[in-house]
Amino acid sequence: MSAEVKVTGQNQEQFLLLAKSAKGAALATLIHQVLEAPGVYVFGELLDMPNVRELAESDFASTFRLLTVFAYGTYADYLAEARNLPPLTDAQKNKLRHLSVVTLAAKVKCIPYAVLLEALALRNVRQLEDLVIEAVYADVLRGSLDQRNQRLEVDYSIGRDIQRQDLSAIAQTLQEWCVGCEVVLSGIEEQVSRANQHKEQQLGLKQQIESEVANLKKTIKVTTAAAAAATSQDPEQHLTELREPASGTNQRQPSKKASKGKGLRGSAKIWSKSN
């Protein structure tokens, strides 16, 4: 595919070089060769040549008009003027049909078979699909044939020559696109600003919580130290006693039981002597 595009550029340059020095019938013959040459789908540079424009006021005006149809028109445009234009070869018909598909693809990316059959004046779907496959291999467009839904889905198509009267419409379209981009950019900037504000609020809240926790720790430490000082004890020892009140109670209880045991044994010995 890429090799075809490269060869196409070389062929087009060759035709342009030959056209610079050609006039009259020789130039008209060269134009017909350009219209039939495989891979050549752009004709604006040829139309801009002064000697080519002179054909419009000569005996070869029909050839000049045919060139403009290939540059800007469609196969339907040719059929509408066929009586005043030179007949097309099969290769020229296929090329003009390829360009007609490109024109349709610029307006809609999913083109029904019915629309294509009418626009290209084809009799059946087989001819249509063969034509589209040929256009794909020529790198005129890329897409897929949806046979189930009977439509052509276009992913890419080449650009066509632009007429001077279309420049204002193109400029307007670009201006609208720029305005749309500015609106989108403004919306993005607003969202970024909101995100930054939310981030700052969360950071402030985090710092506030950390400050409150630090103050609370200081308060607890001061309160504990004051309580320990009031009882003339070491603050750490005071905290230890506060944490383990139950363990101190359990250590005193066994001593009481032991004393009770000794008392019983002593009384038993005294009772024995009296007997």
Curated annotation (Swiss-Prot):
Locate the coiled-coil region(s) and give their ranges.
Answer: 185-233
Question: Does the record carry Nucleus as a key word?
Answer: yes
Q: Where is the composition biased (Basic and acidic residues)?
A: 235-244
Q: GO cellular-component terms in the record?
A: COP9 signalosome; cytosol; nucleoplasm
Task: List modified residues, type N-acetylserine.
Answer: S2
Which InterPro entries does the protein's record reference? COPS7/eIF3m, CSN7_helixI, PCI_dom
Give a short account of its post-translational modification: Phosphorylated by CK2 and PKD kinases.
Q: Which UniProt keywords apply?
A: Acetylation, Coiled coil, Cytoplasm, Nucleus, Phosphoprotein, Signalosome
Gene Ontology BP term (one): protein deneddylation
Domain PCI positions: 2-159
Phosphoprotein among the record's keywords?
A: yes
* Residue segments, region Disordered: 228-275
The highest taxon in the source lineage is: Eukaryota
Q: Where is the composition biased (Basic residues)?
A: 254-263
Q: Which PROSITE patterns match?
A: PCI
State where the protein is found. Answer: Cytoplasm; Nucleus
On assembly, the entry states: Component of the CSN complex, composed of COPS1/GPS1, COPS2, COPS3, COPS4, COPS5, COPS6, COPS7 (COPS7A or COPS7B), COPS8 and COPS9. In the complex, it probably interacts directly with COPS1, COPS2, COPS4, COPS5, COPS6 and COPS8. Interacts with PMF1. Interacts with the translation initiation factor EIF3S6. Interacts with CK2 and PKD. Interacts directly with ID3.
* Family of the protein in this entry: Belongs to the CSN7/EIF3M family. CSN7 subfamily.
Function description: Component of the COP9 signalosome complex (CSN), a complex involved in various cellular and developmental processes. The CSN complex is an essential regulator of the ubiquitin (Ubl) conjugation pathway by mediating the deneddylation of the cullin subunits of SCF-type E3 ligase complexes, leading to decrease the Ubl ligase activity of SCF-type complexes such as SCF, CSA or DDB2. The complex is also involved in phosphorylation of p53/TP53, JUN, I-kappa-B-alpha/NFKBIA, ITPK1 and IRF8/ICSBP, possibly via its association with CK2 and PKD kinases.
Which PANTHER family does this entry report, sorted A to Z? COP9 SIGNALOSOME COMPLEX SUBUNIT 7/DENDRITIC CELL PROTEIN GA17, COP9 SIGNALOSOME COMPLEX SUBUNIT 7A
Q: Can you name this protein? A: COP9 signalosome complex subunit 7a
Q: Which organism is it from?
A: Mus musculus (Mouse)
Which lineage ranks, top first, belong to the organism behind this chain? Eukaryota, Metazoa, Chordata, Craniata, Vertebrata
